[in-house]
Amino acid sequence: MEMATKKCNIFGVDSIGEPEGVVKKALDESLSLLDIFKFIEITNFDLDPIMTNWFWQVMVNNHSTHLGRVVLEWFGYEGEDSNQKQKFIDMLKRNKIPYKQLKHTDNEIELYPSIKEEMTLLPHKGAIASSKWLVMEPFNIKMAMLRLNTKNADIIKRYYIKMEELIRLYAQYTTLFQKREKETMSREMLDLRLMMEDMKITNHRQENMLIESHNMLRSMGVEIKDIRHENNDLLDQNNELLERVDDVLQKVNTVQKKLDISVEDRAPQPDKNTRRERFLLLKRNNDTFPYYTIRAQEINARKALKRQRNMYTDVTVLLDIVCHPNTKTFYVRIKDDLKSKGVEFNLCEINISNSNIDEAILVKEMMKINDKKRDV
């Protein structure tokens, strides 16, 4: 019988099976990723608190570390400071483990605050001049710890093994945390995509129904201004809602990329051109409101322009501003500026017959407002 093999990461962590008890406790504790020290606190992981921080720095740093009296005592060396250090150095020499001793004249001492602190405790300059401070690379410290033959040797080695166990558990925790984040993100993206598809279908049906209704009324010789205004307003609201959903979907995709999560069945990235904002000013053969504005993303702007040309026999584009960062805010500024000149606004429609400007000035004023975005 062949043994079943489990797919694990480089730490031997299985992301498919059930998490271990302490890992499950950490996952249930917070929706945010815990750092390793918070993980130790939450799981009550058994570690010697005296040397945890120092030993962790040795494991993760890639520069030399100062081994002073506190460290040597923790290693199990007894007696005067000089005797402790000499016994430790003798052990290093026997096992051919590299080390370095710094003098007070070495510029490298500036890298070790603990050495500078010890220097301030020495009684006089002569003591400082005769002193040396022991520093070692992280790899060599680990080698030395495994060679210890002091009263604390077994404690040190057990501590080393516990640290390896901690790394393994924390690796399992981070693996399962990212797996959970990926699943949550996938569900949210699927819900958004389904909602967007439903809205697109509904919007398409409404557009077809409105066009059919308008064509039927025109064939009957009926002109219902209020219905037309309501229909245009409804279509604009639908388009704006679709654009907001599209923006949310893009933000979800951006978050997922930052998590470095690969999801096979995800919503496609939106086409850059179709997301560009357009502002159009139209002139139609409408006696009451001859001017009409379209404010939407590229794809929705094209649809709105097509609707206007289906509704009127004479439609001219007087102004077409592409890639405006916010056409909604732009239109608000236009209304604020031109209402003072007597221009009448009704949703997207404009009437200048009772104002003190003509068509040329209307276009010029809108261009002037648009150009203000460059005045930074």
Curated annotation (Swiss-Prot):
Q: Where is the signal peptide?
A: none
For this UniProt record, the keywords arranged alphabetically read as follows: Coiled coil
**Residue ranges that the Swiss-Prot or TrEMBL entry lists as coiled coil:** 178-261
Q: What is this protein called?
A: Putative MSV199 domain-containing protein 468L
Q: Which organism is it from?
A: Invertebrate iridescent virus 6
Its taxonomic path starts at: Viruses, Varidnaviria, Bamfordvirae, Nucleocytoviricota, Megaviricetes
